[in-house]
Amino acid sequence: MTTMKKQELTLAGVPAILYGERSRKVYLYVHGKNGCKEEAERFANTACAAGWQVLAIDLPEHGARKDRPEQLLPWAVVPEIQAVYARMQPVWPHIRLYGVSIGAWLAMQALRAEKLEKALLVSPVV
């Protein structure tokens, strides 16, 4: 069994984890309520085995951001996701979305003008 590469970083001021070996393809993973970026590891095991990387972020009031002042409000989170996505575009020509619950909804709002290759939405709030 091989160990999946895992790198903690900050992207556009947002704590993130990048899973997998260097690739031209990536999934942006946005967790749901009470989730965190680390929960993406299970999905990353499958995606990385297929040649993808997974970039998972922490939403405000979650994970590494639990004790920070930012709030989980659409008008705050949507620009954050847009900023993360803008920094992803020069690095990965193929970007897909994996969103869970409220994270799926927030990502859909943030990226509605973008041409995502594919979106996997788990229990999206609609």
Which role fits each region the language model picked out?
Residues 1-21:
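N-terminal cap/lid segment of alpha/beta-hydrolase-fold proteins
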Residues 28-32:
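The conserved beta1-alpha1 loop
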Residues 33-45:
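The serine-hydrolase catalytic nucleophile loop
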Residues 47-66:
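Conserved alpha/beta-hydrolase
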Residues 63-91:
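Catalytic nucleophile-loop/oxyanion-hole region of alpha/beta-hydrolase
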Residues 97-99, 122:
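Short beta-strand immediately N-terminal to the catalytic nucleophile in serine-hydrolase-like folds
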Residues 99-107:
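Gly/Ala-rich beta-loop-alpha elbow adjacent to hydrolase catalytic centers
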Residues 120-126:
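Active-site nucleophile loop of the alpha/beta-hydrolase fold
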